[in-house]
From Swiss-Prot:
Listed name of the protein: 2,3-bisphosphoglycerate-dependent phosphoglycerate mutase
Subunit structure: Homodimer.
Keyword Chloroplast: no
SUPFAM superfamilies, A to Z: Phosphoglycerate mutase-like
Source organism: Novosphingobium aromaticivorans (strain ATCC 700278 / DSM 12444 / CCUG 56034 / CIP 105152 / NBRC 16084 / F199)
Length: 228
């Protein structure tokens, strides 16, 4: 039976500071690193051991993956880094304090930007301090100026179809270390969650979510490993 492990990166510095992060590259905090290592230890203790790994091009997800694999005794597994697993791009909100943004624009407007399915935040200005167009990791990639959750799903699902799903069908136990919104995309697809309901799904940092799938990759069971 194919098995998929999803893990959101451990707490990042901007999670701690309550800032919009998106594609900007911030590191995990000491707490975030501990969350990642604890997740890997849980994988080892429960015997849920990945044989193949996928992650984004962002440090917080990559480091979470490595710490979890180290704790699980699985640093040797092959990993694939794919930009399509990056967090949703928060456009012109990138770097802003969430509370200050709400005070400036109003709670309802910020809620629409954060939690609507298909309304993106204002675009990031070209040449701003958070413009990643010249970042070497994105050579050949059209870096978005902003994204809605719908936009994020539209890039995550081809990664699923091209890479992750074939690996599961081939018998791999796959771990995906990614971000709140890129993981929402996978959960929505696998669990058949509606556009409206997926926006309210919270995915905690550093907590492995396990999918037991049938041979057609339909969900048999979904659970937090810590609850088993």
């Amino acid at each position: 039976m194919p098995r998929l492990i999803l893990i959101r990166h451990g707490q990042s510095q901007w999670n701690l500071e309550n800032r919009f992060t998106g594609w900007w590259d911030v590191d995990v905090t000491e707490k975030g690193a501990a969350e990642a290592f604890a997740a890997g230890k849980l994988l080892k203790d429960k015997g849920v051991l990945p044989t193949l790994a996928f992650t984004s091009l962002q440090t917080r997800a990559i480091k979470t993956l490595h710490l979890a694999l180290e704790a699980a005794g699985r640093l040797w597994v092959q990993e694939d880094k794919d930009w399509r697993l990056n967090e949703r791009h928060y456009g012109g909100l990138t770097g802003l304090d969430k509370a200050e943004t709400a005070a400036k624009h109003g709670d309802e407007q910020v809620k629409v930007w954060r939690r609507s399915f298909d309304v993106p935040p204002p675009p990031l200005e070209a040449g701003s301090e958070f413009d990643l167009a010249s970042d070497p990791r994105y050579d050949g990639i059209a870096v978005p100026a902003t994204e809605s959750l719908k936009d994020t799903i539209a890039r995550v699902l081809p990664c699923w179809e091209e890479k992750i799903a074939p690996a599961l069908r081939a018998g791999e136990t796959v771990i995906v270390s990614a971000h709140g919104n890129s993981l929402r995309a996978l959960v929505k697809h696998l669990s058949g969650i509606s556009d409206e309901d997926i926006t309210g799904l919270e995915i905690p940092t550093g907590q492995p979510i396990v999918y037991e799938l049938d041979n057609d990759l339909a969900q048999v069971e979904r659970y937090y490993l810590s609850e088993r």
